[in-house]
């Protein structure tokens, strides 16, 4: 079921003392302790203790080097006992200097929030805490549209629908709730990513009928890039977008052509070790800069 929620009037005020970025800026966390040590999602099933930390680090370094060539990349120190900390985008949602911290439902990931909280405080971000009883998993389940003036949020697996109101209060923006109906797509970022220029990259099979109707209402047909099940199960939608460039894992030639025809350059990354843990390119980098700054660096696509 898809619903729209208007933010309440108790939105956080953004002060001039919060961090200001003039370049696209992201936070990444090296996979020093990464491993598939338990099962929290269907991707982990069958891969417990089958991931290679050396290969994961090489793949992470490849993405880090590529991203660093077009953006500033800050690093969060990895902590022992937090093998999923590399998926740093799940730990918060950031916009206008305000960081809405996650409230992880899985016990195995709860310690990550404290480490990110400490880093964000040191950098001057305002914190928007999430109640313990309100599961919310940051960029994993909530995404701004490309203008940064509205939110899309998922529920049904890891984030509860009540968290959507909480997120709306942080920035005083409307939120459209989407229901995830396929357990393989346990996070919104595995099946839905707004792109610059008013485009959406998504897998319709991950959502119920009402949610697909909401997406189709918001995005005209010529702005919807619906992916195949094959591409979806290779984390094609878990993509990082900077202006005219889309960073993603390995995708089919057909999808790459469709993105190119829409005006995007595609950078394909080898991220197989992270797919074993249920993540892709977007999961590995938490956006710190505001969307206008993030997209302007590589050119914002005009909407025609």
Name what the model sees in each region.
Residues 2-304:
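The feature marks the mature, well-folded catalytic cores of soluble enzymes
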